[in-house]
Each structure stands twice: as structure tokens, then as C-alpha cells.
């Protein structure tokens, strides 16, 4: 009988059975095990979301790690990552499409004054606000990577004036793209609705702070689907309380789950989402994970390799 191919699995989001079922048709003989099982000591690959510090280094025969997300801060930030390991991330078209759906929903909530109308409904108040024109509403997408570029292009189909920012120069049809520090400031000052899909790196931690909120248009809306640690939460609350920003929709927080006593929950200008804008789907991502497992075990560089120095 052939020995199973043991792969270490760790995630708080999906039960191990979900990924086992997704990978079975693609890799017959594969067996997912947890890091505390004896078989894990012989495993060459780990697939993971948010592993505890020391877990990766404790597995002596690992050749590589696969992040069960596009972001990789959950593996790298504040944790030891052995330099000899290969490291791949997911770039799943489903996740890009899901993020585009969620951002479109939240952008339209602000564009069409949904919160105002819902509040009026509770008061049985038949009000009608002046309409906005999408072409005269500037939406800035901060982060134009694999997901952000799809989000930006999707918003152009609704005729919004879409601008975007990334660290390096990009070109996206219908989107005015900026880069560098000056470009970042231009997006802040220009956007009616600002959407962050930035990765969490040393350069982006706390990037949305009092200084940058003050540079945004008065009455602008802020949407964050990047990472919670990019926002100085007290500064955001202050910008909302001073009526500089009209509202904030947040899918990511500094601490997740968001503590029950956190002021975001009851703030009238904050919409809280539980990090569901673009969840990893084993069915759609299974092929990519199987391919990365095969490449790592064979000693090849996997597709969508992570540049550890850059953090993405």
C-alpha cells in the first residue's frame, strides 16, 4: 500500500475536512494532518492561515508553506519564518470577484445614501435627497494588486471616476493610476470614497492616521478591506466625530474578532463587517493549492511566490 502524502494544515477559518475534500480529486493519496500529529514531522508542505509563532519552525522536513489567503502578514509579521522555505500565496479569481462585489456594495451604500434612507424609514419619514452622478463621484482604490485592480476596473463599469494608488506604477483601463508619496496624497485629497485594499507591510502599518484623514476631503467616506493594523482606530473615530469624514465601513480590525466593548460597534457612522469581504473558498482555490504543493515537493518555485522582503 502506497504511503500517503502528508501535508500539514492549520487554519481557524475552515475545518480540515473542507480542504481534504477539495484536494482529494486533485491529489489522490494526499492526507492532511495537524501539526501535533506524528505524521507532521515528515511533511514537506504546510498550508495555513495564521499559524502560531514557532509552528512552522517546529516542522523539520518542510520545504515550503502555502498561505490560504492573498495576504501573508498572518504568516510573516512578528513571527519566525525559516529563510530556506519556499512560500506561496493564493491569487484566486473568486476572491477578486468576491472583493469586487463587496466593494461595489459598500461604495453604492454611500453613493446612494443608503444609511440616511434606512434611518428615515425607522422614523416613517418620506425624504428625497438630491441624486449624485457616478461620473462626478471619485472613488480611490488604494492597492492595485491582483485583487485591487479587479475592484478598480469593476467600478469603472458603473461609470464612477476611478483613481488608484500602488507602490509601483500601474496601468488599468479606465482608471487614473498614481504611485509614490505624491500620488498617495493626491488620492487622499481627491476621493469622495476611499477604498483600501493594501497589503500589511512595515510601510503600510498605521498608514491611515490623523495626518492622512485630515488630508481627505471633508465629507468623504472611508472603506477598509485591507488590514486592520493599517488604521489608527482612535484617529478614525476622531475624524468621524468631528464630521470630517461622513462614514467608515470596515471589514478588518486591529483585533479580530472585534471586542464586544469596542466603540466601533455602536458608532453611528461605522459599519462593521466580520472580515468576510473575500473569503478563501476551498472549491475554487483547490487547484492552485494542489499545483503549489506539487511544485514545492519537486523543488520548483511555486506560482505566486511571496517576496518576503516586500511582504507580498
Give the residues covered by each predicted segment.
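N-terminal glycine-/charge-rich "phosphate-binding" loop or analogous flexible N-terminal tail
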Residues: 1-43
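A charged, well-structured terminal subsegment
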Residues: 102-130, 283-284, 288-291, 295
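Rossmann-like adenosine-cofactor binding region
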Residues: 169-263
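Rossmann-like dinucleotide-binding domain for NAD(H)/NADP(H)
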Residues: 225-312
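Phosphate/diphosphate ligand-binding glycine-rich loop within oxidoreductases
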Residues: 44-118
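Short acidic low-complexity segments
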Residues: 31-42, 53-56, 175-190
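NAD(P)-binding Rossmann-fold cofactor-contacting core
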Residues: 157-174
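Glycine-rich NAD(P)-binding loop of Rossmann-like domains
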Residues: 117-150
Amino acid at each position: 500500500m502506497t504511503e500517503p502524502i502528508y501535508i500539514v494544515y492549520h487554519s481557524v477559518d475552515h475545518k480540515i475536512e473542507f480542504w481534504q475534500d477539495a484536494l482529494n480529486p486533485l491529489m489522490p493519496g494526499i492526507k492532511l494532518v495537524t501539526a501535533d500529529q506524528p505524521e507532521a514531522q515528515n511533511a514537506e508542505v504546510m498550508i495555513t492561515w495564521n499559524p502560531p509563532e514557532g509552528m512552522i519552525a517546529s516542522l523539520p522536513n518542510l520545504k515550503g508553506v502555502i498561505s490560504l489567503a492573498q495576504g501573508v502578514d498572518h504568516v510573516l509579521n512578528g513571527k519566525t519564518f525559516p529563510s530556506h522555505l519556499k512560500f506561496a500565496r493564493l491569487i484566486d479569481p473568486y476572491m477578486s470577484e468576491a472583493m469586487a462585489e463587496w466593494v461595489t456594495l459598500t461604495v453604492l451604500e454611500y453613493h446612494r445614501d443608503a444609511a440616511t434612507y434606512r434611518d428615515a424609514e425607522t422614523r416613517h419619514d418620506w425624504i428625497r435627497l438630491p441624486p449624485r452622478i457616478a461620473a462626478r463621484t471619485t472613488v480611490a482604490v488604494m492597492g492595485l494588486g491582483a485583487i485591487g485592480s479587479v475592484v478598480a476596473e469593476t467600478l469603472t463599469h458603473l461609470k464612477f471616476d476611478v483613481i488608484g494608488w500602488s507602490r509601483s506604477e500601474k496601468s488599468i483601463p479606465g482608471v487614473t493610476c498614481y504611485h509614490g508619496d505624491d500620488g498617495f496624497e493626491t488620492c487622499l485629497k481627491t476621493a469622495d470614497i476611499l477604498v483600501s485594499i493594501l497589503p500589511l507591510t512595515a510601510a503600510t502599518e498605521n498608514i491611515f492616521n490623523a495626518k492622512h484623514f485630515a488630508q481627505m476631503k471633508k465629507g468623504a467616506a472611508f472603506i477598509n478591506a485591507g488590514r486592520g493594523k493599517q488604521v489608527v482606530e482612535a484617529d478614525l473615530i476622531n475624524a468621524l466625530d468631528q464630521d470630517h469624514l461622513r462614514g467608515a465601513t470596515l471589514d478588518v480590525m486591529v483585533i479580530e474578532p472585534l471586542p464586544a466593548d469596542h466603540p466601533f460597534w455602536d458608532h453611528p457612522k461605522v459599519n462593521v463587517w466580520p472580515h468576510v469581504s473575500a473569503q478563501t473558498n476551498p472549491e475554487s482555490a483547490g487547484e492552485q493549492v494542489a499545483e503549489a504543493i506539487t511544485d514545492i515537493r519537486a523543488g520548483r518555485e511555486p506560482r505566486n511566490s511571496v517576496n518576503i522582503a516586500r511582504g507580498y
